């Protein structure tokens, strides 16, 4: 685990974004942990989050031309990542996002920001079922661009309805990498190292044994 990944997990726990206990997921599974990126909800938190995304972008080595934030949650994530890449890594890259509704006045259309062209890095919080990414791929294809990869905050490393995770299905179906700031593997490592949080380790390990990939 890299230093920025350890810092990100600590930061997510401090913000209440990553919590441990008993949570019912949309899938109906009872999970011993929950991740809610919507709680990175202050200016300072968003700025720090962008720096973690930027570190993961650099770490991934993915070659791309433009950042894309899918509406709605991906919009601030793409924006703060673009700022952090420019300020921390001297990489001033274009970014854009889509609207859910087309506008019939002003600039019109469903895309806002830089042109969606060339190699596109999609920025989002998590991939649960992969439905949102499939919709994004249609938008990218319609512009004649191509997806270079997807960057998310947390990879739950968890099977969907079949043997693969939603992330593995996206990688298989679109032939592109999905990378994350951290994965469940690193969360487990962090729990094992933390005297206070170690008590949650057995439940998370049991959950991974049942649903993990």
Curated annotation (Swiss-Prot):
This protein's UniProt keywords: Glycosyltransferase, Magnesium, Pyrimidine biosynthesis, Transferase
Superkingdom: Bacteria
Cofactor: Mg(2+)
Signal peptide location: none
Record flagged with keyword Ribosomal protein: no
Coiled-coil residues: none
Enzyme class: transferase
CDD domains referenced in this protein's UniProt entry, alphabetically: PRTases_typeI
EC number: 2.4.2.10
Pathway(s) it belongs to: Pyrimidine metabolism; UMP biosynthesis via de novo pathway; UMP from orotate: step 1/2
Any one GO MF annotation of this record: orotate phosphoribosyltransferase activity
Positions of orotate binding: 34-35, 128, 156
Its biological purpose: Catalyzes the transfer of a ribosyl phosphate group from 5-phosphoribose 1-diphosphate to orotate, leading to the formation of orotidine monophosphate (OMP).
Family annotation (NCBIfam families): pyrE
Protein name, per record: Orotate phosphoribosyltransferase
Organism this protein belongs to: Pseudomonas aeruginosa (strain ATCC 15692 / DSM 22644 / CIP 104116 / JCM 14847 / LMG 12228 / 1C / PRS 101 / PAO1)
Lineage: Bacteria, Pseudomonadati, Pseudomonadota, Gammaproteobacteria, Pseudomonadales
């Amino acid at each position: 685990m890299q230093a920025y990944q350890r810092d990100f997990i600590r930061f997510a726990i401090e913000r209440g974004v990553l919590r441990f206990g008993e949570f019912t997921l949309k899938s109906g599974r009872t999970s011993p942990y929950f991740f809610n990126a919507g709680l990175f909800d202050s200016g300072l938190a968003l700025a720090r989050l962008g720096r973690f995304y930027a570190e993961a972008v650099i770490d991934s080595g993915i070659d791309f031309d433009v950042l894309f934030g899918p509406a709605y949650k991906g919009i601030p994530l793409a924006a703060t990542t673009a700022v952090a890449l420019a300020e921390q890594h001297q990489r001033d890259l274009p970014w854009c996002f889509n609207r859910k509704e087309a506008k019939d006045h002003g600039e019109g259309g469903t895309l806002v920001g830089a042109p969606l062209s060339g190699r596109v890095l999609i920025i989002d919080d998590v991939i649960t079922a992969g439905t949102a990414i499939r919709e994004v791929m249609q938008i990218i294809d319609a512009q004649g661009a191509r997806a270079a990869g997807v960057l998310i905050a947390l990879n739950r490393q968890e099977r969907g309805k079949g043997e693969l995770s939603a992330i593995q299905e996206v990688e298989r179906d679109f032939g592109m990498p999905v990378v994350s700031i951290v994965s469940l593997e690193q969360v487990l490592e962090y729990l094992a190292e933390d005297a206070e949080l170690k008590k949650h380790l057995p439940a998370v390990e049991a959950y991974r044994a049942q649903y993990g990939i």
